[in-house]
Amino acid sequence: MTLEEKVGQMTQITLEVIVKKDIEGEIIRPPEIDSEKMRKALVDYHVGSVINTSGAANPLPVWQKLITTIQNTAMQETPHHIPILYGIDAIHGANYTTGATLFPQQIAQAATFNRKIVENNAAITAYEVRASAIPWNFSPVLGMGRQPLWSRFWETFGEDTYLASELGRAMIKGYQGTDLKDTTHVAACMKHYLGYSNPRTGKDRTPAAIPDRELRQYYLPPFRAAVEEGVLTTMVCSGEINGTPVHANKTILTGILKKELDFKGFAVTDWEDIIYLHTRHKVAPTMREAVKMAVNAGIDMSMVPFKYEEFADLLIDLVKSGEVSEERINDAVTRILYVKKKLGLWETPITHYEGYNKFAGDEFKKTNLEAAREAVILLKNTNSTLPLDTKQKIFVTGPTANSMVPLNGGWSYNWQGTRADEFAENEQTLLEALRDQFANVSYEPGVDYDKEISISNAKRKAASADAVVLCLGESSYCETPGNIEDLVIPEAQQKLASAMVETGKPVILILLEGRPRIVSHFADDVEVILLANLPGNMGGRAIAEIISGKINPSGKLPYTYPRFANHLVTYDHKGTQALTKTDGSPEFNPQFEFGDGMGYAAFDYTNLSLNKRILEGDETLEISVDITNQGKMEGKEAVLLFVTDHFASITPAVKQLKGFQKITLAPGETQKVSFSLKQSDLSFVNKDLKTVFEPGAFSVQIEQLKKEIQWKK
């Protein structure tokens, strides 16, 4: 390959660059390829990757035509017949394909604590993405949800490193399968490597300050697990850590990712991020220097995505001048071609939707509904208010009650998720689903998200109801448009909540939101709190079934739900992070804790057993517990194992999740659940940035059962 061809493989453009536009510069719908623009990019500049949709979701035949045209040009009109690698953000289903199955978002999938659900959802997503003729998916997000202000919090698996690592593995397994040449699977992309998810301000793409030890302890492990699972690509963090943009950080991109983790795939930038080294981060005085910095640091592919000529010309010149070695170029291109070969794109550059007859079928809808059911978290149920009798008169109010938008969130049919009501018109809003379950349902919105509409009307209607279903939360958003100044739920919604409480009727609060908006002003006054996060297209039905008692809720919180805006502490905090003002004793008082969540069945935990209380070396600690369903309904239960290190050279966390299993129990049934731990499971990163095990005393805890062990060297 010539240098120009190699640089082309490292260049990624957005579909908008090569489609036809009208006289006003708007993309023609449905989108069509502009042959002249396409040939300039693919033939003249040898561009190797195309991404994105054309503003909104496309039907299968449109995707088929677009990608067939692109691939035919790449395979027939370029010297080496190298296929294009087409990528898409299909983060909770094939969300840019009309009619596809849209699952709960990642934060809601995390609430299931169910590896199999996550894997199955990913496998169906892969199937429907390949039905769209697309072989590469920009998912999963493996950043840690430890900054609840962040506008991409809902794209994470929550705040716990172990949970994110395990569910990340499951999602990659579902996406990639065992054979990527099987055209029902896609290449996964772990993102956003590394540290992107904890900006100090809480605002997207703003700087993070994360000490190296914490970076390795909390933020690196999910990416390490993904590499072990065989993930093929990674997208790089758009922000900076400790003053250095990650796109220019050779230690993180080459030293850790490619050498220490032995990552074999390639690293792609996020949107325009090489440009931002010059225009936003101000570490590169010119665009030329920005390209040099990024490629030398270890970037293999640039999501340009518009000015591809400039990127290519600058990189070619940098190689010719010796400022970027051809060896670095060869490494990048080898990695890119490796992924294309693993996907079998030379043999099957195009997949045809006619061969995917399961697309959006009943089997996939059933899987989606089960995921949504397990994602809903019952956090409060005073006096067993739920389930409601279906003969009761229900009044429904709030901004999230009658729209598909808050059920799905961002990355749903369009970038910001604002068109879900248009594209998902055949799906049920929560209000519509409640009307299916209950005979007598009335409705008044009361407020928009942040402004009052008709609170007095809502209060009057509520007075004649048996119960109020109060639907609060957030509209859809993604990335920087979702930045907020305050976690407290908007004042208009607070006023609506107060008005409903004043009626004296039982209030069932439903929260549809992408991050934990603070509700402490009225949380103590409502009888029920159901947190659904972003449960997807089947979320309305799942919530309604839980309210009516058809389904027993089983979700658990994958993050700490704060009580106060200035007390954002994770469950695995150090004891010194939560001290009282007086004697310095621990005080951790969130609205709800990580792992909280109840059902209609009472689960009794007994007989916590250990095979040994004193262990040495590479021995295995075997832990078991008996769980009995004391209720009258079948129920699912997420069993969580926590470990506390009593003393360590680095201040230990008060507890850490080290195992979880999801089980199903019939009424009266007892199951024994077992876990195994090795020394490595109790290791941590020390002050020298080495992962070490220190012998000593530990406690293992499942629910309220706790036992202490000693582990010697």
Regions inferred by a protein language model and the residue ranges of each:
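Glycoside hydrolase catalytic-domain context in secreted enzymes
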Residues: 1-686, 692-708, 712-713
